[in-house]
Amino acid sequence: MPDAVKVGFVPFSVAARGTLVVLCDDALKFGPATSKALGVAVSTVKRAVAASQFKGKSGSALDLLAPEGLKVGRLVVIGTGKAAALKDYDVLKLGGAIAGKIGAGDTAVTVIAELPGGAMKPEQAAAIASGILLRAYKFDRYKTKKKDDDANALNANVSIAVADAAAAKKAFAPDSAVVDGVILARELVNEPPNVLYPEEFAKRAAQLKKLGVDIQILDVKAMTQLKMGALLGVSQGSAHPGRTVIMRWNGGKRGEQPVAFVGKGVCFDTGGISIKPSASMEDMKGDMGGAACVVGLMHALAARKAKVNVIGAIGLVENMPDGNAQRPGDIVTSMSGQTIEIINTDAEGRLVLADVLWYVAQKHKPKFMVDLATLTGAIMVALGTDHAGLFSNNDELAERLTAVGVSTGEKVWRMPLGPEYDKQIDSQFADMKNTGSRNGGSITAAQFLQRFVDNTPWAHLDIAGTAMGAPKNDINQSWGSGYGVRLLNALVAEYYEAKK
């Protein structure tokens, strides 16, 4: 969690201090506990609200000097929109909107978690806390000069006033684990590539041992013995050898079939011999966003002690050009035994995933596999930065991912698969080639991956537009978004986790 912002829960009866934040709907109404907290100043506040351009729209804010009678220095009114229609993600965004109004000078903040109809449920209060922490995260580890008046330099203790503080604290415990998982994923994506290379990434993933996650790290020797020729071909041009990390959380019944998540972890992608243009190449430090998500997800599931068996697997490489680098025209043999003609060395992520998907399918026999990868620019052309591309061989899995995408705000959009696309990756020299035609590039990339899932129920999420550099929003002000952690945590919790 962000060290500079701390959240806790207190009863409504605790006196507000510092900055007071209250909620108001689009009818400009306050709840009873809010009116009581405002005391004799309530009429003054209502007049100020009515006289302003503030309409109570969701996430809107009105910042006021505290009127006489209030023992706080500042009053912030946050709009909820139609309070009765608020969904879980709406409440999370309210928390983010609150964090957005916390200034560098605010050291104590009290938020009255109440809607006009009455107190928020404990789960809603927990969502407010999560939204505050997700919005407050910043990555400034490498800045040697930090400005005290930086709007992002938050250093506040936030007290969330609720009807039942103990119940809210209990509801927040699993949510807090998910927040930590999202922030871990963001940290990994934001790290520079000279710091986070495959061996270092593997070490950081191994820190999940502290939470009870079993860790297995496959080095070059182990991957060579497994005949992971597709992954090793990508990494052979780098001074940093590749790694595959297998994480296992045993939270379900002994022997119960696990669910599995696989992440692409290209720690830096130059394109290899098919080198990329220099413009924005620095962003290719984020080409491991899928692997970052899987590590963050495993943290979340283990920290909240999810009642399910889970495999998390990440393939970690750098794609670099040197005298040992893979060439266009090379033919490699994957772990599956299928041969691949390399047409473009910049279509490397699918090669990494091919071997890791096959390994997981054969070794662990999961109920399903979901892979995440910043795989193609084509998906950004198709969907922009608001949706990840979803490809699947299983309608039920696709429908479930779509449903939790809506509920979490981490949206997906299903794209087609079919034989007419699959034939585009047939090769005259090998079993397949690693790129198809220019058209439908995200689809042919998914068709390639499907050849390595061995009939396992599978979904592929192309997160090129959502994992890094996406537009900032109410709950994320970071370049690395941590996309996918909340989505997949919800998938597990909603459909695959043993109920209490």
Swiss-Prot record:
It catalyses: Release of an N-terminal amino acid, Xaa-|-Yaa-, in which Xaa is preferably Leu, but may be other amino acids including Pro although not Arg or Lys, and Yaa may be Pro. Amino acid amides and methyl esters are also readily hydrolyzed, but rates on arylamides are exceedingly low; Release of an N-terminal amino acid, preferentially leucine, but not glutamic or aspartic acids. GO terms for cellular component: cytoplasm. GO terms for biological process: proteolysis. Keywords: Aminopeptidase, Cytoplasm, Hydrolase, Manganese, Metal-binding, Protease. Mn(2+) 2 binds at residues 264, 269, 287, 348. It comes from the Bacteria. One of its GO terms (molecular function) is manganese ion binding. It is found in: Cytoplasm. Mn(2+) 1 binds at residues 269, 346, 348. Its EC number is 3.4.11.1, 3.4.11.10. Binds 2 manganese ions per subunit. The keyword Manganese applies. Its main location: cytoplasm. It holds the Pfam family Peptidase_M17. It is an enzyme of class 3 (hydrolase). The active site is at 276, 350. PROSITE patterns: CYTOSOL_AP (PS00631). Its cofactor is Mn(2+). NCBIfam families: PRK00913.1-2, PRK00913.1-4, PRK00913.2-2, PRK00913.2-4, PRK00913.3-5. HAMAP family: Cytosol_peptidase_M17 (MF_00181). Belongs to the peptidase M17 family. Presumably involved in the processing and regular turnover of intracellular proteins. Catalyzes the removal of unsubstituted N-terminal amino acids from various peptides. This is Probable cytosol aminopeptidase. The lineage of its organism: Bacteria, Pseudomonadati, Pseudomonadota, Alphaproteobacteria, Hyphomicrobiales.
